[in-house]
C-alpha cells in the first residue's frame, strides 16, 4: 500500500480530505478594469454568470501594489510588494461566488508576483488589496459538482 492509497500514512485523517465528483462547465474570459480588486472581481464574475464555483485557468496583467499572505512559523504574515506595475506571473486556485456573502466559503487564490525590481514573491492573494493597474485579463472555468 502506498501513501496515495493509505491516507493515514502521511498523517492526514479522512476528516482532512474531501473527494468530490464533478465536471467542468462554461468558460468566462473577462477584462478587469483599473483599480478593481482581483479577488473581488473574480467572485463577482461567478455571481454574474451564476457559477457557484470556478477554477482559474489564466490571469494576465499587473497590479498597482501586491499583497500576499503566507504562513510562517509564528503564524500568518502578509507581504506588500510595492508598485505600481507589479506583474502577475501566475494565479491558481478556486473562486467561490458564495465567498462574497459567506466567510465559510472562502475564495482561495495563490499567486506568484514580480516586483518592479524583478524579485518574485508567492502567497495567497489578500482580498481587497490587489488592485488592477491598467487591466487584467482572466479566464475562469466553472466546476459543477455531481450529486452522490
Show where each model-derived region lies.
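N-terminal intrinsically disordered, cationic/polar leader segments
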Residues: 2-57, 64-148
Amino acid at each position: 500500500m502506498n501513501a496515495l492509497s493509505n491516507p493515514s500514512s502521511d498523517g492526514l485523517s479522512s476528516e482532512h480530505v474531501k473527494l468530490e465528483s464533478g465536471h467542468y462547465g462554461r468558460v468566462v474570459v473577462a477584462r478587469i478594469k483599473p483599480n478593481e480588486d482581483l479577488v473581488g472581481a473574480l467572485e463577482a464574475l461567478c455571481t454574474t454568470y451564476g457559477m457557484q464555483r470556478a477554477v482559474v485557468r489564466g490571469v494576465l496583467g499587473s497590479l498597482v501594489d501586491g499583497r500576499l499572505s503566507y504562513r510562517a512559523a509564528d503564524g500568518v504574515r502578509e507581504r506588500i510588494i510595492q508598485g505600481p506595475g507589479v506583474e502577475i506571473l501566475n494565479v491558481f486556485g478556486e473562486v467561490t461566488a458564495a465567498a462574497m456573502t459567506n466567510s465559510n466559503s472562502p475564495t482561495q487564490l495563490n499567486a506568484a508576483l514580480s516586483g518592479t525590481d524583478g524579485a518574485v514573491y508567492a502567497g495567497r492573494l489578500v482580498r481587497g488589496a490587489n488592485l488592477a493597474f491598467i487591466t487584467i485579463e482572466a479566464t475562469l472555468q466553472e466546476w459543477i459538482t455531481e450529486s452522490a
